[in-house]
Design a protein with these regions (language model features):
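Acidic, low-complexity, intrinsically disordered peripheral segments
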Residues: 403-488
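Periplasmic alpha-helical coiled-coil/stalk elements that build and connect Gram-negative outer-membrane
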Residues: 2-3, 126-241, 351, 355, ...
Length: 488
């Protein structure tokens, strides 16, 4: 409790929340979708881009303005004691009849908004992939720590039994030292596994904004693999749906449209103008003449404004050339995106197949390692195998179990990588993986592998009562037989 209180205080100050119950993959993603700042930022950029279309369209619509003026004039010298006031109001209307630059600007913004929409879709898929990867990395770290803890317990039992057998003269001190060495090695591995789990949990928190005391773990019994579609079918689908490729195509279209927009600098413009106005003049003062009579005047005007650029110092031609170079660059980027999409699809396809093969291989490796360990333990009990053989077999078994677990998680992540490469990754894919999950499991290292102070103390004190204890008879004979290095 003393360790938990500072954590809770830190979370409350940091603005992070802690889930009150175990969450599965789909629930974790749904929480991330609502709070992930990267996705929300991309959504805001997309909305701003679409809103800017309205701004780009506005110059093509009628422009209506209302003006009003008030002027007071006070004379001096010859016009002394003469003053006047003028009040006027006007209403102006301007309508573009032909201005290709404004139409091109609207088209450019529409294409820009389309690119931003694809960027948002990419952010959605990235969040799905990042959430699933972080989630499975936590489960993988839990499994690694669990197997490391199980390996530690197994080696501890060997160390304890070997120490007892040495104390009664059944084994040599080297057996105890070998067991102790393996135990110390697995303790170092446990420290690393605990740290990896803490970091994995923190990475998931960074994606979702939440800490999860427990998560739904992988249901190994229900887990199964499926081979992907033929790679040619995947490549064909990626050609039309890969988001990076789609964004590059839209960028090329945008660059092509920019050339057309630059060329409008040579084109004429034609605007319609219309206005109506009213003016009220009032005169006063002791010396106001008879000619300065009060009057109210009004006027209506309609006109056309035509403009044809003849020469602008070469600026328009330069802008066209710049746009053409930008189009070449966008075309090369499209080719690069195309190659990258092919490479990503093929790599993801290969990774899925490799994961499936690895799962099958490690399943058999676990079975073989377990059989080997059983045989080594039986051989050690009758003296045909050494403690080193038993310890090596134990390490091999738990390494195979860890590799099998890692292969399962890699398979699921690689499945999502294929979907992402195709541009079809969505929430339904997470639901499919979510069906592979089962019981809840704690994410704290102290829950996965509780520290046992008594066991640690026993292991530290697991030293032979006498380092000079008599070597067992069988070992003495072996020593005497090998005392002469040249003897045969």
């Amino acid at each position: 409790m003393n360790k938990l209180l500072p954590l809770l205080i830190g979370l409350s100050l940091g603005g992070f929340s802690v889930a009150s119950q175990a969450e599965n993959l789909l629930q974790v993603y749904q929480q991330a979708r609502l709070s992930n700042p990267d996705l929300r930022s991309s959504a805001a950029d997309r909305d701003a881009a679409f809103e800017k279309i309205n701004e780009s369209r506005s110059p093509l619509l009628p422009q209506l303005g209302l003006g009003a003026d008030y002027t007071y004039n006070s004379g001096y010298r010859d016009a002394r004691d003469t003053n006047s006031t003028t009040k006027s109001a006007s209403l102006q209307l301007t309508q573009t009849i032909f201005d290709m630059s404004k139409w091109r600007a609207l088209t450019l913004q529409e294409k820009t908004a389309g690119i931003q929409d694809v960027t948002y879709q990419t952010a959605q898929q990235t969040l799905i992939l990042n959430t699933a990867t972080a989630y499975f990395n936590v489960l993988n770290a839990i499994d690694t720590l669990s197997y490391t803890e199980a390996q530690k317990q197994s080696i501890y039992r060997e160390l304890d039994q070997t120490t007892q057998r040495f104390n009664v003269g059944l084994v040599a001190i080297t057996d105890v030292q070998n067991a102790r060495s393996q135990y110390d090695s697995v303790l170092a591995s446990e420290v690393s596994a605990r740290n990896d789990l803490d970091n994995a949990v923190e990475t998931l928190r960074q994606v979702t904004g939440n800490y999860y005391p427990s998560l739904a773990s992988l249901n190994v019994d229900a887990f199964k693999t499926e081979k992907p579609q033929p790679v040619n079918a995947l490549l064909k689908e990626a050609e039309s749906r890969n988001l990076s490729l789609l964004s590059a195509r839209l960028s090329q279209d945008l660059a092509r449209e920019q050339i057309r927009s630059s060329e409008t600098g040579h084109m004429p413009t034609l605007d319609l103008t219309a206005s109506t106005g009213l003016s009220n003049n009032r005169y006063g003062g002791d010396r106001a003449s008879a000619n300065n009579t009060d009057n109210i005047t009004g006027s209506n005007q309609v006109g056309l404004s035509f403009n044809l650029p003849l020469y602008s110092g070469g600026a328009v031609s330069s802008q066209v050339k710049q746009a053409q170079y930008a189009f070449v660059a966008a075309s090369e980027q499209l080719e690069s995106a195309h190659r990258s999409a092919i490479q990503t699809v093929r790599s993801s396809f290969n990774n899925v197949n490799a994961s499936i093969s690895s799962i099958n291989a490690y399943k058999q490796a676990v079975i073989s390692a377990q059989s080997s360990l059983d045989a080594m333990e039986a051989g050690y009990s009758v003296g045909t195998r050494t403690i080193v053989d038993v310890l090596d077999a134990t390490t091999t078994l738990y390494n195979a179990k860890q590799q099998l677990a890692n292969a399962r998680y890699s398979y699921m992540i690689n499945q999502l990588n294929i979907k992402s490469a195709l541009g079809t990754l969505n929430e339904q894919d997470l639901q499919t993986l979510n069906n592979h999950l089962g019981k809840d499991i704690g994410t704290s290292p102290d829950i996965v592998a509780p520290e046992n102070a008594q066991q640690a103390a026993n292991a530290d004190s697991a030293e032979p009562r006498s380092a000079s204890k008599t070597t067992p008879v069988s070992n003495k004979s072996a020593t005497r037989a090998n005392s002469n290095p040249f003897g045969q």
